[in-house]
């Protein structure tokens, strides 16, 4: 799938604009602070109903405006189109509409418009807390395994019940045992989906990484959140007293992690910033391949400041891999001359100059 049309109103410093992007490569260039990243933020808002720059949405709404709105016309892989719209009012009301109907949740947006973000904060995937890697993992599982979301919702409900009981002791023994059973059943299902996903992801990631950079010995492994040699029911029973003292459940899928190691060390501790960026890109591109295989569709990639941290050789390699995905890509940079070479002649490339919030489409640099 791809975005055929994007309409943006009152998002940060952007002037109201309607964009007709290329179904493949789109390059947004201009000076720092011109609004390039805000375009990516608008697309992200359309696909996930949240910003990647702020946990609060009020800063996204343009000064002295009551609301921001993003509308998108999506070209579906199987043919036809779907119309998506999100609107956020300054008072807090959030509206999501799909083909003229109010959506039940942001998950419906995510399913229709699978987005991959690569930006300066992407290093957190390697350096940050396990929660960030779980989000990466679960994004991938969500898009290839339709049974994942109901199982994840069951897990969250069981965890809330158990944690409430641990803090307040409000459940009788029979109810406590019932919720523990539900927690274990949902956990086993989640663990199975995650393990299957990592099994499929690893060879694609390794192949993709090898085309970007030589990092012999880099390993990707999955920790499920409790001892691999013990049943979760046994672990919960043995840690009950400590769980009560802590007020939450310490073992289970909510503690899962992905581990990237090189020469026995955490990869983030020994890789350069450029190498870390390439590892993250390889992970994101590998996910895109799996989405294509499972859904017969494509992710949309948002790549903020692609040239940073990379020399010419690695920039070209990354662009080639993004091009080979045959998906829609939005790339920001200060100087588009850094990205002018390397695209195949038949690949449609659109250029957009961004200056003080105004966006102007310019000629394909190959013409």
From Swiss-Prot:
GO terms (BP aspect)? DNA replication; DNA synthesis involved in DNA repair; double-strand break repair; SOS response
Q: Which residues bind ATP?
A: 30-37
Pfam families hit by this protein: SMC_N
Principal subcellular localization: cytoplasm
Does the record carry Protein biosynthesis as a key word? no
Instruction: Report the HAMAP family cross-referenced here.
Output: RecF
The UniProt entry, under Gene3D superfamilies, shows:
P-loop containing nucleotide triphosphate hydrolases (3.40.50.300), RecF/RecN/SMC, N-terminal domain (1.20.1050.90)
Listed A to Z, the keywords are: ATP-binding, Cytoplasm, DNA damage, DNA repair, DNA replication, DNA-binding, Nucleotide-binding, SOS response
Cellular component, GO annotation: cytoplasm
Per the entry, what this protein does is: The RecF protein is involved in DNA metabolism; it is required for DNA replication and normal SOS inducibility. RecF binds preferentially to single-stranded, linear DNA. It also seems to bind ATP.
- Could you tell me the gene encoding this protein? recF
Q: Which GO terms describe its molecular function?
A: ATP binding; single-stranded DNA binding
Annotated localization: Cytoplasm
This one is known as: DNA replication and repair protein RecF
The entry assigns this protein to a family as follows: Belongs to the RecF family.
